[in-house]
Amino acid sequence: MIEPVVGYRMLQAIGWPWPGPPADAAWQAMCAVYSQCRPARVIEQHRSGYVVAEAPEVPIKVESLPAWQRRGFPRHERAVVGDWVLLDGRRIVALLPRRTVIKRLAAGEHYRQQLIAANLDTAFIVCGLDGDFNPRRIERYCVLIGSGGVEPVVVLTKVDLCADVGAAVAVLREHSSQALAVVAVDAREAEPVAALYPWLLPGRTVALLGSSGAGKSTLTNTLLGEQRMKVGEVRQRDSRGRHTTTHRALLPLPSGACLIDTPGMRELKFTGEEDLVEEFADIELLATQCRFRDCAHQAEPGCAVRAAIGCGTLDPQRLHHYFKLRGEIVGAADRSTLRRY
């Protein structure tokens, strides 16, 4: 890999994780193979191709690898917003290994993974304190995000529509066994949004995830300090919004961090590669104390999970949701296996 034309400081401004050449062994090996190429980051993805950057506010339209356009090429092996690539002129010639990635199962009957964003440090789960507030859905987001190696942070918006914000925060904490960060803000105002700055330090990359109408575009505009993203109205009957964000885009923030805004997601299907170790650490720990290793936590003797329910230290509904999510993950894994044969 050749020295970036703009220098590493400019690359750092769009999320390059080192002050100089890559310190990761896998990156070093690939950069050695493509020694005459230069690094860039994918900041937009369209059907017609990609837009990358080597510095803030300097977009470059580039050609993708020819293999990515071939029918049947795995979609999850193509570049996505947040990825780092190597360029030869205006052509992508290689995709650098991902440090983290958030993905889901695409809608439809066929098994197909859909990547949301790559090389993230944190994901803000944006949820309005109106009809959009759904602790179980947030729990599902946390599983998807945590399984990709990304830190989840819940950002509650529309605080003016909630009579008891503290109660909503308490409900979320009850539904999570991990030390889940929950921040309630008025997404329209800069002062309360400043509570998010600990996750928006220079060099960090954060994605906004959530339903349409949750306030992602409003929050983006406040963080940018300008009205760049279109904001849509929300239907009162179901608190649903229209898709004002139609594609994923990486935006450098004044704080020095990078923000990836994403369209609203209605479905959160698992790929089969997730685990519940982080989000359901309490149940996973109890399971290690059961008499039998293959305990199904139903009516087996010596079941520590059932004992916890009996003494009131574990909510039966939490166990029910654990079984539900685990069943979905196993089912998706089975579909993935069948697809290979």
UniProtKB/Swiss-Prot annotation:
Enzyme class: hydrolase
Coiled coil: none
InterPro entries linked to this entry: G_CP_dom (IPR030378), P-loop_NTPase (IPR027417), Ribosome_biogen_GTPase_RsgA (IPR004881), RsgA_GTPase_dom (IPR010914)
UniProt KW keywords: Cytoplasm, GTP-binding, Hydrolase, Metal-binding, Nucleotide-binding, Ribosome biogenesis, RNA-binding, rRNA-binding, Zinc
Pfam families: RsgA_GTPase (PF03193)
Major subcellular site: cytoplasm
Cofactors (names): Zn(2+)
UniProt: Zn(2+) binding residues: 290, 295, 297, 303
GO molecular-function terms, A-Z: GTP binding; GTPase activity; metal ion binding; rRNA binding
Cofactor note: Binds 1 zinc ion per subunit.
Record note on quaternary structure: Monomer. Associates with 30S ribosomal subunit, binds 16S rRNA.
Protein name: Small ribosomal subunit biogenesis GTPase RsgA
Organism annotation: Xylella fastidiosa (strain 9a5c)
